[in-house]
Amino acid sequence: MKDRFELVSNYQPQGDQPKAIDQLVKGINEGRKHQTLLGATGTGKTFTMSNVIKEVNKPTLVIAHNKTLAGQLYSEFKEFFPNNAVEYFVSYYDYYQPEAYVPQTDTFIEKDASINDEIDKLRHSATSALFERKDVIIVASVSCIYGLGSPEEYREMVLSLRTEMEIERNELLRKLVDIQYARNDIDFQRGTFRVRGDVVEIFPASRDEHCVRVEFFGDEIERIREVDALTGEILGEREHVAIFPASHFVTREEKMKKAIINIEEELEERLKALREEGKLLEAQRLEQRTRYDLEMMREMGFCSGIENYSRHLTLRPAGSTPYTLLDYFPDDFLMVIDESHVTIPQIRGMYNGDQARKQVLVDHGFRLPSALDNRPLRFEEFEKHIHNIVYVSATPGPYELEHTPEMVEQIIRPTGLLDPIIEVRPIEGQIDDLIGEIQQRIERNERVLVTTLTKKMSEDLTDYLKEIGIKVTYLHSEIKTLERIEIIRDLRLGKHDVLVGINLLREGLDIPEVSLVAILDADKEGFLRSERSLIQTIGRAARNAEGRVIMYADKITNSMEIAINETKRRREQQEAYNEKHGITPKTINKKIRDVIRATHAAEDQEEYQVKEEPKLSKMTKKEREKVIAQMESDMKEAAKALDFERAAELRDLLLELKSEG
């Protein structure tokens, strides 16, 4: 079992990083429960945390407040720890409509979801890694506090296979079905197995390329091989292999029987209560739905929406804490909360929203009351999982300030870049003044971010700037994640010179080409102009040596004063450090493709694209066969998904490649 973290980097800790690393490591080793890393934008907080993880050498959970940020962190940690298990655990839904009921219109909305198979694979990879090794970093979104199956049950259901082990072939098949693998001799994919005489091939739920081939001689396993699922190429011999369940909600047969009895008892009690209240329609609805689920569980071992019965399946008492990803970690793991000023309030709010929706379903006979126990953790339950935690933020929130009176500061940037100079200018004539500033930046091939207070103002300003010939675009909340990434990329490439937005110019928008951030109506106190929002927005100009911030305001508010003073304090520290060490600030030179790559989580290998024709002449015979096999598989997948244009494109290319070969 591998159990040491190996940090791979061309950089050494610089500036404030060595001091911050030492303080955090010392705090963890001394058993300090809560610590906060107050890290200014661009000071290399991820690199600092990577060094801390390496030094304390504990399994680590990193929680981010959205999938995009989690994907960015996943990519960065994967680069720093290429020889360790860096995993990704976010919600596997591309689209999710939870079941709900609107009593006013008597409308029941069925659960509707589209599951991303790649992310499901990564979730299984994350949980199995925790049972197999200690050098694990899991980057997760807040979905990690939602219910998952029992870790003990999951561990007990792992199928351990060894060479020379005595087991009947049919018994192995039964055990695979018990852990929710499906037999499919034709469409072999993740979470399935196929049988060919004395050979059983298993496609683990945590993989997408390699499968396990188990060869029998009588009632004994003669050989275990790892095989390329696409080409059939043998990759190696194995003495032992562990097959993890294909679902996190797996239950042994005897537990399932007990759970079914308990569900039936609860159903009878609930039906009696509903009938006594005169809710006959609700009682009929509940009985019909629950009995159908019970029949499915008896016959198949699972049903649609089985997570709503998770309390019974794990034999937990009513109201008890559900199992989550946090229970899969050992007791002394390290937790890191990224952008904690946003993530902590998000964790706090999850429980109430979930309960409000489910209570309506219970009241109107769509679910049993036990469905309320399939829920995210309450905040106090989440706190019980904290052993060592590091909050990471440029602007720590009240919770972090309360629990960590002493901050670990990281103000100095390794690049020598300073926090930007801030000017306050009057609101009267702000647009004309702004246009003059934009023109100066365009001449120097630099970019500008403008933040407004309302959607209408953003749209009007964008239209006005377009009319006078400025290349401008508008970023708003309705733009999808990938479109947003494209817009940021186009800004960096110079297709746009100005980006206008409302609350979108804060966390995670690191664009070195931006030399000016303009904050309109800076003196309007509120969420968008609070001290934290202002400091985060100011930080967007800290990646450029010419960084400036202009606040348009008629008076200096308390929030403005705090933000200006904090920025000034940091800048003075940075200037003193640069002077002492003879450092000249230089704008970060960040490759433009990094912006895109960092946000496509878990894409270790570039997807095969039709436009990028493989050069067959430069390939070996084996490589050529693999490319052709992959294309055939892609063509069939496209046809199955009714994407016939893509399938035809692949077919034509395939014929061309085969004729060349």
UniProtKB/Swiss-Prot annotation:
Its main location: cytoplasm. Keywords: ATP-binding, Cytoplasm, DNA damage, DNA excision, DNA repair, Excision nuclease, Nucleotide-binding, SOS response. Residues 625-660 form the UVR domain. InterPro entries: Helicase/UvrB_N (IPR006935), Helicase_ATP-bd (IPR014001), Helicase_C-like (IPR001650), P-loop_NTPase (IPR027417), UVR_dom (IPR001943), UVR_dom_sf (IPR036876), UvrB (IPR004807), UvrB_inter (IPR041471). One of its GO terms (molecular function) is DNA binding. HAMAP family: UvrB (MF_00204). This is UvrABC system protein B. The gene is uvrB.
